[in-house]
Structure formats: C-alpha cells, structure tokens
C-alpha cells in the first residue's frame, strides 16, 4: 500500500472532476492502487529517497514537501491508469465499461488529459526538487547524487532551451548531454574539483561566507552560460569565454578557488604569451 496516498479521501484531493462513488461501486483508490504503489516507488527512487519517504507521512498535512510529493504520486499513477480505467476483463476478453448517461471520452480528449497529467507531474517535480534540497536527510541520498552531477540541477532546464512539453523526459536527455559537456570543460579548463564544488553549492545552496561566496556564484553563472551555449549550438566550447573564466580564477584573491589553483589544470595556463627576451630574435628596446 502507498504510504503517501493511504486512502480514497487523500487521493480525491488531487484528482479533479471525479463523480462520487455510489454504494457497492469500486472506489477509485482501489482501482488504481497498483499504479499508486508503482508511482510512489518511482518517486522514491528518482527523487525522494527512502529516508525522506520514511518520515514524510508523519508531517502535517499542510506541509509543502508532503503536499507536492502526494501530488506527484497521483499524477504519475493517473498517467498510467487512465488508459485502463474503462476496460474490464471478461470471459470473452476485454470490454469497455458503458454508461447510458455519460458519453465515452474521445481519443483526442484522453490524449489531452494524459498530456495535462504529464505537465502537472512535471510542474510538481520542479517544485519538489528545491524543497528536497533543503531537507537534511536528502543531502546524502542517491537521488541527490544524480542531480549533483551537473551545474544546473533544476528541472526548468528544458525551458531555457525553448522546450515546454515532456519536461522531465527532455531534462533527462539534457542531463546526459551536460555531463559530457562538463567532462570536457573540467579536463580542458576548470577541473573536476572546482565543478564539484560549484555543483554542490548550487543544488544545496551552500555558497559559503563572504568574501568567497560572490566569486563562486559568479564563476557558476559564467560556466553555466558556456554550457547553455554548447547545448544550443551543439558545438565546441567558446574558447574566449572559457579563457575569461580561467583568468578570473587565476586572479582571484588568495584562499579563493584553491581547489583549482593547486591542480595541474591551473598550471596549463601559467607563463603563456610573448615575453621580451634579449635571447629571442624579436627583442626590442
């Protein structure tokens, strides 16, 4: 049984336009119970973590994290259950439930409903993630590690590239691309250590104290802008922009960006450029 959606009354808070059940009729909760369990398992594995799920039901019903977690479970469950709700298995095969007072929904209406449920789920997930990031038990979970793999963990990433439908699906595609992009940027310019620091700071909102915090936030913004460019253009890194960030790292005050300055990556950018040397043919007074 679902821990987040324990009964029909809780379920109906998140399902609009449901006719009240008459005596003897199967409750909607009973009809979609398997889908609720699968949806909760998916949400737990992908977002919540077992630790967060264990304590969520103990929270007040008005708690934001509990509210949006329930909404996400119901939307995901209904997304899978809707195509089956009017089907029954008879001895002669599957049949469609008929009602003389209510016309069956057309294929187009059902498709619009499914798209609406998907959008509701994706919107709910985008609200849920920042709430989870502020939950102490979540910071060491597997879902946290997944979203900590890129500089921009938030689910509105597809919108920044002009995509509005199928946001969660599109996010996962972009997530994989960002990982590949950041591997290249880390190797050539910024180091794995610095990017790891920036990723964690953005997701968990742990930027440290002044005077270092503004430097790290600025570096995050500039590097993420480079990544967005590479996502849009599907091309190579913009070298001038990367060098500009590198120079800001090199010229930062002592004690700032030390996770970068102490590495071989930083050494790649030392002592470059022309120097006026008497031993060289181009020497000038």
Model-inferred region functions:
Residues 1-70, 84-285:
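Conserved short "hinge" loops at termini or chain/domain junctions
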Residues 73:
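Catalytic-loop motifs flanking and including active-site residues across diverse enzymes
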């Amino acid at each position: 049984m679902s821990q987040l959606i324990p009964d029909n009354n809780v379920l109906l808070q998140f399902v609009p336009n449901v006719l009240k059940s008459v005596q003897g009729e199967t409750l909607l909760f009973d009809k979609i119970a398997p889908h609720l369990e699968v949806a909760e398992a998916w949400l737990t594995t992908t977002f919540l973590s077992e630790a967060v799920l264990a304590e969520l039901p103990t929270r007040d019903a008005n708690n934001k994290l509990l509210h949006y977690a329930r909404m996400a479970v119901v939307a995901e469950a209904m997304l899978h259950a809707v195509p089956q709700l009017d089907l029954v298995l008879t001895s002669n095969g599957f049949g469609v439930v008929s009602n003389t007072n209510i016309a069956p929904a057309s294929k187009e209406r059902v498709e619009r409903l499914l798209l609406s449920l998907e959008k509701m789920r994706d919107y709910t997930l985008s609200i849920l993630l920042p709430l989870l990031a502020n939950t102490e038990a979540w910071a060491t979970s597997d879902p946290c590690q997944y979203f900590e793999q890129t500089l921009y963990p938030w689910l509105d990433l597809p919108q920044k590239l002009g995509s509005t439908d199928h946001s969660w699906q599109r996010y996962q595609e972009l997530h994989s691309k960002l990982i590949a992009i950041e591997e290249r940027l880390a190797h050539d310019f910024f180091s794995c250590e610095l990017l790891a620091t920036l990723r964690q700071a953005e997701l968990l909102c742990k930027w440290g104290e002044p005077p270092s915090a503004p430097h790290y936030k600025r570096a995050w913004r500039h590097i993420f802008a480079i990544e967005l460019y590479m996502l849009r253009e599907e091309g190579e890194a913009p070298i001038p922009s990367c060098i500009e960030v590198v120079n800001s790292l090199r010229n930062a005050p002592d004690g700032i960006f030390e996770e970068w300055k102490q590495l071989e990556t930083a050494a790649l950018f030392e002592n470059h450029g022309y120097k006026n040397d008497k031993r060289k043919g181009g020497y000038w007074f």
